[in-house]
């Protein structure tokens, strides 16, 4: 009999619960389609860098409170161990208004005199008409080295960024009369990038939103479980597929158990054979119903805390999980045996937060380190921009992205089209991250570097060594270390040593 640690056992219990949730779907994904969803298309494996865009009516108040989530803290918020009263996400502004003790609720009362959230719609749409230029966005994303773009087409507030033919039964005309999804898709693809759509599948606050209990419980219980909502999500997702053929289908907060997920997956892959999906498709509405049972929320929190106590458990795969795994303001402690995508904002929020300053943003070196570390661990980075209500990407967000683009222009071959090596880092000396192709091993040395520097030897035979962006004048190997002399010191923030195999 095999014995498991408490954390590993908890992980297996979570997998079992996930499979139960999947079985609860009225139309579960077939084994064949599930396997197809886990086969990553080569373009996605090679792309490494994507741009996420959160933009909508919440960009008008542009208010959220709190510092960025730390690794693992999102789960702590969900499992009730965080002291936070509200997420630092602008796109959750409407949810924060539900609780009078939040900073967002106080701000809304002071600035907007508690006006209904729907009042932001005409303001947002007028601003978009005045200021948005999708071609300029696409030019900028291409210049920073992005290979794909994922637009939030509907967030939890239910507002759609395209003129949907599927009527919201609870809120008339709750969507853009302008086809912003189509305009951006055309602009992005015209510049050779792929285009994907995010759609809030599990939550839509125009259908239901609770605020009378434990906040974790409220989020779970707010996932609509009705047949009406399942049909609505299916119809809008199918409409997105028909209109835009998204290369990425990005779900969030689960998928309604009555939403015909199996049929949707089969339809998507038939229409977009080279497409891919993420992993957030569990039947969260079933979880919400369980959360309504006395004591059930406590048990789920306890199970989650147990699982989170061991980082190694996160590296284990879940056979019921579709698509690539997502990590939000988080990472892994090693190289997972599955493809994954790290996503976060440049600051604490995904949507534009007018309170944030340049000091709240990732610096260019931090963003480069984030990308390099993720790619070395078999991941892609989907870095978010939050435009203001006029569609302008703030300068403080542009700055780190431009720095990343400059670095990628020199060192992109160590990122694009690479795969993880047998290990992601070195064991001694300077911090290094490894990537590889059939012809080369890349050692990406993190941090500023002098004209002469020393790193640990990878311990493999090679034909020759280069340093990208510089001329290598001299190389000495001694006691498992390599010392290299460049013609000029590179400014950093990371340099790439290429071992030609």
Segments (PLM) and residue ranges:
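Accessible peptide chain termini
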Residues: 1-2, 351
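Bacterial N-terminal signal peptides that target proteins for export
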Residues: 2-14
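C-terminal motif of bacterial Sec signal peptides marking the signal peptidase cleavage site
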Residues: 22-24
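Mature catalytic domains of secreted/periplasmic carbohydrate-active enzymes
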Residues: 26-501
């Amino acid at each position: 009999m095999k014995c498991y640690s408490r954390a590993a056992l908890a992980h297996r219990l979570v997998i079992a619960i996930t499979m139960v949730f999947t079985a609860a779907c009225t139309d579960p994904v077939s084994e064949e389609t599930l396997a197809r969803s886990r086969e990553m298309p080569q373009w996605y494996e090679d792309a490494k860098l994507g741009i996420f865009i959160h933009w909508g009516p919440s960009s008008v108040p542009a208010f959220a409170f709190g510092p960025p989530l730390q690794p693992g803290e999102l789960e702590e918020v969900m499992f009730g161990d965080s002291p936070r009263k509200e997420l630092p996400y602008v796109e959750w502004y409407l949810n924060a208004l539900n609780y009078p003790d939040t900073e967002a609720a106080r701000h809304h009362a002071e600035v907007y005199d508690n006006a209904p959230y729907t009042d932001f719609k005409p303001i947002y749409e007028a601003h978009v008409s005045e200021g948005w230029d999708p071609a300029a966005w696409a030019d900028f994303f291409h210049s920073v080295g992005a290979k794909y773009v994922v637009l939030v087409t509907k967030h939890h507030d239910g507002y759609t960024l395209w003129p949907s033919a599927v009527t919201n039964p609870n809120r008339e005309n709750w969507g853009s009369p302008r086809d912003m999804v189509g305009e951006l898709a055309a602009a992005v693809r015209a510049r050779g990038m792929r285009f994907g759509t995010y759609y809030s599948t599990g939550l839509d606050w125009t259908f239901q939103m609770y605020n009378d209990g434990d906040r974790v419980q409220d989020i779970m219980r707010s996932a609509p479980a009705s047949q009406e909502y399942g049909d609505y999500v299916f119809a809008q997702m199918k409409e997105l597929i028909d209109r835009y053929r998204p290369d990425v289908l990005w779900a969030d907060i689960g998928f309604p158990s009555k939403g015909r997920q199996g049929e949707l997956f089969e339809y998507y892959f038939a229409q977009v054979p080279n497409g891919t999906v993420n992993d957030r498709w569990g039947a969260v509405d079933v979880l919400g119903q369980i959360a309504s049972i006395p004591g059930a929320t406590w048990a789920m929190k306890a199970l989650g805390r147990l699982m989170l106590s061991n980082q190694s458990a996160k590296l284990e795969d879940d056979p019921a999980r579709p698509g690539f795994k997502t990590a939000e303001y988080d990472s892994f402690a090693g190289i997972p045996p599955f493809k994954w995508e790290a996503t976060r904002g440049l600051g604490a929020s995904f949507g534009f937060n007018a309170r944030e300053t340049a000091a709240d943003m990732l610096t260019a070196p931090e963003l480069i380190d984030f990308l390099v570390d993720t790619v070395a661990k078999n991941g892609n980075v989907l870095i978010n921009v939050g435009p203001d209500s006029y569609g302008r990407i703030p300068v403080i967000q542009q700055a780190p992205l431009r720095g990343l683009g400059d670095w990628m222009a020199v060192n992109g071959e160590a990122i694009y089209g690479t795969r993880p090596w047998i290990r992601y880092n070195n064991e001694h000396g300077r911090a290094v991250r490894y990537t590889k192709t059939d012809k080369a091993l890349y050692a990406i040395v993190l941090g500023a570097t002098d004209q002469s520097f020393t790193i640990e030897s990878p311990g493999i035979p090679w034909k020759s060594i280069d340093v990208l962006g510089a001329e290598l004048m001299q190389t000495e190997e001694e006691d498992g270390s390599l010392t290299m002399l460049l013609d000029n010191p590179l400014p950093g923030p990371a340099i790439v040593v290429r071992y030609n195999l």
